[in-house]
């Protein structure tokens, strides 16, 4: 993409669309003819993001523009500058789009009126923007977010009534607002209080234009900033400049589902954005900066040399000498040579005060490789602390100077240990937050454990500050620890325990001691040991390594007071606490478990992950969060990755038969395309299938009541037991509810199908458990399998646990005859888990069995499986007809087919499985007939397969009931026996 400079043309021609670009003659662009389409993006933006497609034409206003050295100019309106969040003279990347995407479908919203009129030629439109027709807006476009609206575009029109009104984009932006005029003598000298928020860039305070006027300050003026504390002199003021912070937004947000509203909201008048380093030096809490006191800087004056004018605004003097110390960190070596890094940093004058921590950027610094550990650029910033400043300090609240390469001599005085400010790590915004979505409670608990050891009297605390964090892989353990360290200003040293494993115990011991020694050199710090269960095991992984376990325990319980000031805290993560040696586990006085994500937490994570992505109007994130029951943070991130991949596959498949060319794909990526609900659905199915096969993760089946024929009374009883507590929890405030349901009856009557349909209709996750699969040969493993089933169900709540063949899992105790009493213990564990369901409101248990008389009687007592529902065979023709209609509703039947006549040829006693066998046999007969007709050339391959009356009658003649009349009578006797109890 070529580099270009934006020049404001004022006034902008009224006959030209406000978001178009005028090309001066003689530029690098080809002859426009009927016009060009350019893709524009700010020069600092990533090339992977969508760009803004604009029309480029030659206009009368472009004739007088003189081409000078440097990038070619583009004449634009102020409206386009606002869209790109840039100012006049900004540089952009411009790319010629030779084949702009042609929109295949678009949804337009129009106000009541004459509607759309005819237009000659294609029209370049963007989702969320207004059309030249008054009162019309583009709500949705396919396949791209922006493209050409032409004769081949299918239009869907809806009324604008009830939707968001036209925002500020419909107003005329060709003329800028009048600039603020504030005289110096009218400026206020009083102290003002503003609410601080962590944010902004650089070293300056960010305020809105109206707030700057209300403060009586000028752009770039120096002010004293201090915390508003109850105790006097508790916070030493810091010097900073005031800059107007313009609201910014990304193009993907502008073209998102809420793009009809103004993307960038103006800053509140009483709000000030504080850079992280300045907030740290002020002693502010990163989460809640609180109220700040702003006072004009009245002392000193900057008199630039060799200039004909000087600023009337007062400013701090330059320091003659600046003595700094490098702060020890695990991400860079404190013994490296960073003269060039410091020289480039101080080429711009910087404010320095004694005790301040300076953040020096290493972006683009190749020299940092020489001083980096392992010769890798592991950290984007380096930290230094101001030890002493020498200069003529004017009288004021504190001594503050400016330091640069011209007026100041810089001395590096050594190393120091100190807290550091929390800065963005360069990861995506959800994981770079001080309160990661879905993990706020865990981060708060970690901070509550670590913070007392950082207080002045923290060395007097008994016990170590070691935390064991347990959670499944991908649950956000490392993210939570990183956020806690950022809140507390701690260094973080991440060490995967797989890198500490070695061939001998002595080598592992040496690596452990070196790791702890390295962490102590950069205190206060947190040493994060991931997968700590890998340590303390022998090479085969079967037994414990006593030497390694003893060494790790000794390092964790080190009580040396000198080494704890500043402290070194250890956080270890594991997926299974049971795999950790007992001696190591007892060395952690604090154990935390990553909580299961609730539906609200999953929704907040999805909203954070998709905040900068264009979504289709039909995407329902709350419904998607409901379907992701049991997912951890990593699963939701993988869901988004699979969704993007599915969207790319869909876009490629939507092209011509030969596929999209490389140029077409590039133009489509520049225009951007939304993520649709079908992309999320396809990705979710892939993940749920993979999880179900790997770990038995619960999922929601796709079975509805239309798939279940008959059984109306059974449906009613099941819904009263399960649906009522979900829809009206206030009716069950006394805790009186049924959580267990037992379906019994002959085989093949649809007991499993009923349970799946209930899960689908009530939007519940479904966890199917076969009785024999929980039995294990090892002692205690069968009981643990039962506990894990209920734990997975609680994690995926609201959930239904379906126990099929329950009589094989929970027979009557004392009759099993096994030598170890395994079945008796399994039944006892199952009873204990069922009793604990009363504390979990959204977990239901459904059991299915053919022989309820073989079950342990304790299972059928109140509070467990206290609702018995008999699912019998269909005996009357009306119920059999409903079942047969449900099975054949997806078949293509001939018009002459009569299902009632088919049933007249069948035996009287039929179960649902028998009727399914009838349809399967008839379909096989139809397939054989189809193959025979194709071989004889009597039928085309493209014709549909029809099920004829003859096929069904042949299958009915061969049908034999799977349950005899004697067996049905026996099942009815069992029903009467349990109904009388």
Swiss-Prot record:
Chain residues that bind ATP? 471-478, 745-752
So what does this thing catalyse? ATP + H2O = ADP + phosphate + H(+)
The EC number on file is 3.6.4.-
Q: Which SMART domains match?
A: AAA
Cite the entry's keywords alphabetically. Answer: ATP-binding, Cell projection, Cytoplasm, Hydrolase, Membrane, Methylation, Nucleotide-binding, Peroxisome, Peroxisome biogenesis, Repeat
Q: What is this protein called?
A: Peroxisomal ATPase PEX6
The entry's family comment says: Belongs to the AAA ATPase family.
Its job: Component of the PEX1-PEX6 AAA ATPase complex, a protein dislocase complex that mediates the ATP-dependent extraction of the PEX5 receptor from peroxisomal membranes, an essential step for PEX5 recycling. Specifically recognizes PEX5 monoubiquitinated at 'Cys-11', and pulls it out of the peroxisome lumen through the PEX2-PEX10-PEX12 retrotranslocation channel. Extraction by the PEX1-PEX6 AAA ATPase complex is accompanied by unfolding of the TPR repeats and release of bound cargo from PEX5.
Q: How does it assemble?
A: Interacts with PEX1; forming the PEX1-PEX6 AAA ATPase complex, which is composed of a heterohexamer formed by a trimer of PEX1-PEX6 dimers. Interacts with PEX26; interaction is direct and promotes recruitment to peroxisomal membranes. Interacts with ZFAND6.
Q: Which PANTHER family match?
A: AAA-FAMILY ATPASE, PEROXISOMAL ATPASE PEX6
The Swiss-Prot or TrEMBL record annotates one GO molecular function as: ubiquitin-modified protein reader activity
Q: Chief localization class?
A: cytoplasm
Which first-to-last residue range defines the signal peptide?
A: none
Omega-N-methylarginine: residues carrying this PTM: 119
Q: Which organism is it from?
A: Mus musculus
GO biological process: one example: protein stabilization
Name the source's superkingdom. Answer: Eukaryota
Q: Where in the cell is it found?
A: Cytoplasm, Cytosol; Peroxisome membrane; Cell projection, Cilium, Photoreceptor outer segment
Q: Which Pfam families match?
A: AAA (PF00004), DPBB_PEX6 (PF25395), PEX6_vert_N (PF25394)
Q: In which tissues is it expressed?
A: In the teeth, expressed in ameloblasts and odontoblasts. Expressed in the retina, at higher levels in the ganglion cell layer and photoreceptor layer at the joint between the outer and inner segments.
SUPFAM superfamilies referenced in this protein's UniProt entry, alphabetically: P-loop containing nucleoside triphosphate hydrolases (SSF52540)
> Has keyword Glycosyltransferase?
no
């Amino acid at each position: 993409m070529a580099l270009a400079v934006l020049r404001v043309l004022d006034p902008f021609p009224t006959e030209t669309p406000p978001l178009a670009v005028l090309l001066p003659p003689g530029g690098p662009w080809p002859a426009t003819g009927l016009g060009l389409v350019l893709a524009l993006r700010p020069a600092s933006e990533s090339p992977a993001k969508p760009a803004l497609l604009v029309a480029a034409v030659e206009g009368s206003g472009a004739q007088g523009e003189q081409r000078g050295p440097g990038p070619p100019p583009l004449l634009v309106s102020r409206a386009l500058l606002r869209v790109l969040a840039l100012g006049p003279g900004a540089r952009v990347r411009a790319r010629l789009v030779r084949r702009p995407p042609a929109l295949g479908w678009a949804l337009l919203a129009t106000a009541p009126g004459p509607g759309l009129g005819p237009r000659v030629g294609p029209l370049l439109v963007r989702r969320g923007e207004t059309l030249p027709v008054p009162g019309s807006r583009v709500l949705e476009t396919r396949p791209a977010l922006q493209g050409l609206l032409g004769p081949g575009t299918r239009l869907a029109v809806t009324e604008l009534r009830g939707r968001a009104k036209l925002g500020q984009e419909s107003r005329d932006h060709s003329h800028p607002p009048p600039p603020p005029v504030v005289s110096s003598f009218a400026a206020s000298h009083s102290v003002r209080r503003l609410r601080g928020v962590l944010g902004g860039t650089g070293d300056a305070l960010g305020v809105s234009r109206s707030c700057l006027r209300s403060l009586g300050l000028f752009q770039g003026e120096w002010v004293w900033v201090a915390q508003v504390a109850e105790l006097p002199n508790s916070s030493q003021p810091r010097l900073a400049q005031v800059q107007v912070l313009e609201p910014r937004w990304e193009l993907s947000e502008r073209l998102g589902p809420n793009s009809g509203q103004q993307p960038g909201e103006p800053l509140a008048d009483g709000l000030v954005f504080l850079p992280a380093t300045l907030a740290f030096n002020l002693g502010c809490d990163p989460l809640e900066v609180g109220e700040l006191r702003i006072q004009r800087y009245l002392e000193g004056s900057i008199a630039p040399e060799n200039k004909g004018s000087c600023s009337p605004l007062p400013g701090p003097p330059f320091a003659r000498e600046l003595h700094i110390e490098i702060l020890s960190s695990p991400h860079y070596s404190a013994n490296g040579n960073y003269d060039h890094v410091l020289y480039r940093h101080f080429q711009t004058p910087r404010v320095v005060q004694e005790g301040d921590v300076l953040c020096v950027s290493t972006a683009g610094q190749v020299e940092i490789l020489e001083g980096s550990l392992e010769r890798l650029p592991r950290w984007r910033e380096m930290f230094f602390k101001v030890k002493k400043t020498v200069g003529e300090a004017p009288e004021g609240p504190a001594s503050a100077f400016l330091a640069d390469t011209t007026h100041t001599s810089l001395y590096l005085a050594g190393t120091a240990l100190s807290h550091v400010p929390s800065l963005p790590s360069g990861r995506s915004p959800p994981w770079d937050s001080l309160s990661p979505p879905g993990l706020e409670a865990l981060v708060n608990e970690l901070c509550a454990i670590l913070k007392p050891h950082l207080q002045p009297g923290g060395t007097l605390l008994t016990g170590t500050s070691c935390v064991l964090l347990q959670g499944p892989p991908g649950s956000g353990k490392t993210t939570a620890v990183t956020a806690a360290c950022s809140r507390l200003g701690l260094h973080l040293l991440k060490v995967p325990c797989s890198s500490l494993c070695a061939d001998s115990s002595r080598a592992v011991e040496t690596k452990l001691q070196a790791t702890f020694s390295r962490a102590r050199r950069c205190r206060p710090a947190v040493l994060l040991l991931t997968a700590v269960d890998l340590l303390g095991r022998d090479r085969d992984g079967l037994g414990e390594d006593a030497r390694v376990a003893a060494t790790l325990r000794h390092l964790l319980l080190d009580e040396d007071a000198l080494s704890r000031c500043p402290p070194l805290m250890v956080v270890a993560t594991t997926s299974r606490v049971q795999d950790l040696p007992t001696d190591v586990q007892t060395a952690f006085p604090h154990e935390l478990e990553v909580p299961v994500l609730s539906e609200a937490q999953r929704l907040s994570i999805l909203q954070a992950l998709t905040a900068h992505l264009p979504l289709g109007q039909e995407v329902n994130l709350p419904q998607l969060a409901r379907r992701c029951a049991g997912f951890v943070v990593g699963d939701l991130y993988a869901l988004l990755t699979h969704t993007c991949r599915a969207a790319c596959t869909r876009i490629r498949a939507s092209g011509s038969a030969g596929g999209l060319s490389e140029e077409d794909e590039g133009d489509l990526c520049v225009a951007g395309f939304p993520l649709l609900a079908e992309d999320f659905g396809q990705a979710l199915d892939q993940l749920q299938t993979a999880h179900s096969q790997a770990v038995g993760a619960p999922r929601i089946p796709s079975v509805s009541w239309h798939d279940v024929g008959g059984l109306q009374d059974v449906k009613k009883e099941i819904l009263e037991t399960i649906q009522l507590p979900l829809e009206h929890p206030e009716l069950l405030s006394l805790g009186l509810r049924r959580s267990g349901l037992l379906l019994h009856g002959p085989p093949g009557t649809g007991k499993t199908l009923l349970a799946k349909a209930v899960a689908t209709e009530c939007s519940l996750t479904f966890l199917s458990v076969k009785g024999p699969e929980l039995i294990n040969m090892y002692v205690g493993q069968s009981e643990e399998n039962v506990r894990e089933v209920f734990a997975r169900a609680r994690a995926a709540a609201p959930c239904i646990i379906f126990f099929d063949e329950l009589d094989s899992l929970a027979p009557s105790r004392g009759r099993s005859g096994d030598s170890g009493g395994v079945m008796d213990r399994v039944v006892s564990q199952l009873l204990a888990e069922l009793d604990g369901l009363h504390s979990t409101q959204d977990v239901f248990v459904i059991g299915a069995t053919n022989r309820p008389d073989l079950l342990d009687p304790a299972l059928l007592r109140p509070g467990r499986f206290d609702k018995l529902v008999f699912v019998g065979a269909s005996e009357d023709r009306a119920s059999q007809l409903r079942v047969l209609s449900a099975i054949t509703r997806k078949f293509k039947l001939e018009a002459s087919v009569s299902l009632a006549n088919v049933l007249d040829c069948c035996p009287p006693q039929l179960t649902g499985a028998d009727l399914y066998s009838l349809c399967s046999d008839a379909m096989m007969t139809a397939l054989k007939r189809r193959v025979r007709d194709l071989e004889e050339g009597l039928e085309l391959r493209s014709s549909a397969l029809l099920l004829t009356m003859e096929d069904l009658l042949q299958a009915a003649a061969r049908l034999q009931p799977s349950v005899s009349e004697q067996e049905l009578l026996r099942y009815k006797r069992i029903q009467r026996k349990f109904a009388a109890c």
